[in-house]
Amino acid sequence: MRTHFMKNQSVKRNQHVSTPAIPASICADGLISELVHNEDHPGMTQLLLLPLLQQLGTQSRWQLWLTSQQKLSRDWLLRSGLPLDKVMQSPYCGTITTVEAMIKALQTGNYSVVLGWLADEISETERKRLQQAAKSGQALGLIMRSECNVLPSARPLHGLRIQSSLYH
């Protein structure tokens, strides 16, 4: 994951963000969604993801980032308006898959959102297990996938495909 930030696109920590409240039913029912992003245009991903993460940051629960590469920057988190005291990052660990880590984290109910960066498609069985875990923990699970890892014919289930080239 890259933690680049768009120039002149910072959010003051105590500034009110005018994003609509997340319906309680989303967290109560649990939800798994997938965001396919273009790593060459991290600003677009941030524009879509940050309002959601800022809203979830108002909850008493943690946000868990299961990343495979870079460490989250404290400065980036501050500029993004995300609560430092509620964001946890766990880098990829070879003993457990990211999907298994997401399932375990979602089940605990300790996290409002669990973001997992996955390189490969997941099976329908894994998706069902993730959905059940999200429902059990009343949490949101976000599968983050780079579009270079997605086959042209593959489409994310319950997700959003970002065609960054259309916006630039």
UniProtKB/Swiss-Prot annotation:
Top-rank taxon: Bacteria
Q: Where is this site: Essential for degradation by Lon protease?
A: 168
Please outline how this chain is modified post-translation: Is rapidly cleaved and degraded by the Lon protease once DNA damage is repaired.
Q: Name one GO biological process term.
A: negative regulation of cell division
Which stretches does the entry tag as region FtsZ binding?
Answer: 105-111
InterPro entries per the record? Cell_div_suppressor_SulA (IPR004596), P-loop_NTPase (IPR027417), SulA_CellDiv_inhibitor (IPR050356), SulA_enterobact (IPR047696)
Give the record's keywords alphabetically. Cell cycle, Cell division, DNA damage, Septation, SOS response
What does the record say about induction?
By DNA damage, as part of the SOS response.
The record's listing under Pfam families reads: SulA
Stated family: Belongs to the SulA family.
Task of the protein: Component of the SOS system and an inhibitor of cell division. Accumulation of SulA causes rapid cessation of cell division and the appearance of long, non-septate filaments. In the presence of GTP, binds a polymerization-competent form of FtsZ in a 1:1 ratio, thus inhibiting FtsZ polymerization and therefore preventing it from participating in the assembly of the Z ring. This mechanism prevents the premature segregation of damaged DNA to daughter cells during cell division.
Share what the entry says about its subunit structure, partners included: Interacts with FtsZ.
- The identity of this protein, by name, is Cell division inhibitor SulA
Q: Which organism is it from?
A: Erwinia pyrifoliae (strain DSM 12163 / CIP 106111 / Ep16/96)
Q: What is the lineage of its organism?
A: Bacteria, Pseudomonadati, Pseudomonadota, Gammaproteobacteria, Enterobacterales
